[in-house]
Amino acid sequence: DLEGNDVDYSLFSANAVTVVNFWFNGCKPCVAELSKLNELNETLKGMGGELIGINTETLDGNKSGIEEALKLLESQGASYRNIYFDSDTEAGRYAGNIMAFPTTILIDRNGNIVGEPFLGGIDMTSS
């Protein structure tokens, strides 16, 4: 993850559902929703789930991308887990094909995408 901890696909099996949010540092709508996503993660944790962020500027361990992402997360009060991976993995190829940000997907315990991706910011005021 962005904090230097090892992560593998077992993180999905630990959760009833994992919400994965793809974002990047220069995306204003992405950064604007970081604090709301942190609130969503707290709600999900109470229901056996987790929200995970994937900043596409951190792929392959891009140090400057990671440093900037960590600053943005801290400035927005977002402490939920953010991970990166190599761009030549299945997840890396998926991230590389995203054309609209933020994009959010649901992952089941087996690491499968459930339903269609949600494009755009998450509005939690309607819940």
Show which residues each predicted segment covers.
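N-terminal "domain-start" segment that seeds a small globular fold
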Residues: 1-9
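Short hydrophobic alpha-helix segments
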Residues: 10, 115-118
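A short acidic/small-residue loop/turn micro-motif
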Residues: 14, 120-123
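Short, internal strand/loop/helix patches
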Residues: 67-105, 109-110, 118
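Hydrophobic "anchor" residues
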Residues: 6, 112-113
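Structural microenvironment flanking redox-active thiols in thiol-disulfide oxidoreductases
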Residues: 31-75, 87-92
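Short active-site neighborhood of thiol/selenol oxidoreductases, capturing the structured segment around
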Residues: 8-31, 37, 50-55
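Loop/turn elements at helix/coil->beta-strand transitions in domains of secreted/extracellular proteins
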Residues: 14-18, 45-52, 76-81, 109-112
